[in-house]
């Protein structure tokens, strides 16, 4: 995989899940992205929401023990020195604006993630669900596997 990425990127929950699931067909691709972060070639950012969604996927979907999930996610965050963004006092206002300007709101949670990103001055996200973010002004969504 050739690196054409640089700078700050939010990693969507799907990438975190693939990167923690060694049986995933995307595991090695995401691992390469993690390596770029470790090497300082990109800055990996996640929102608190991504952490919650990843925990949910492993506990409810994979039926993994909560202790194992916490250990693995904390280890990933620490090992890669991942920067974590959070909603701020007015994130809901941007969320409502995005939502009200959408003709067909597809994924409410992605809209809230986009609002959190914009409030933190970040507009780029790596995700396999680019269509969910492509309708949101100010957000650049890239599928790293294309």
Residue ranges and their predicted role:
Residues 131-139:
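Short loop/helix-cap segments at secondary-structure boundaries that form the rim of catalytic
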């Amino acid at each position: 995989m050739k690196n054409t990425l640089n700078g700050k990127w939010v990693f969507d929950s799907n990438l975190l899940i693939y990167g923690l699931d060694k049986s995933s067909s995307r595991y090695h691709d995401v691992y390469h992205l993690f390596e770029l972060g470790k090497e300082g070639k990109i800055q990996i950012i996640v929102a608190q929401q991504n952490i919650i969604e990843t925990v949910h996927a492993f506990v409810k979907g994979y039926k993994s023990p909560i202790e194992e999930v916490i250990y693995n996610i904390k280890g990933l965050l620490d090992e890669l020195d991942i920067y974590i963004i959070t909603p701020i006092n007015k994130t809901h206002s941007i969320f409502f604006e995005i939502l009200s300007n959408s003709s067909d709101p597809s994924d409410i949670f992605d809209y809230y993630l986009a609002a959190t990103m914009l409030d933190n001055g970040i507009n780029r996200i790596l995700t396999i669900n680019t269509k969910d973010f492509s309708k949101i002004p100010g957000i650049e969504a890239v599928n790293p596997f294309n």
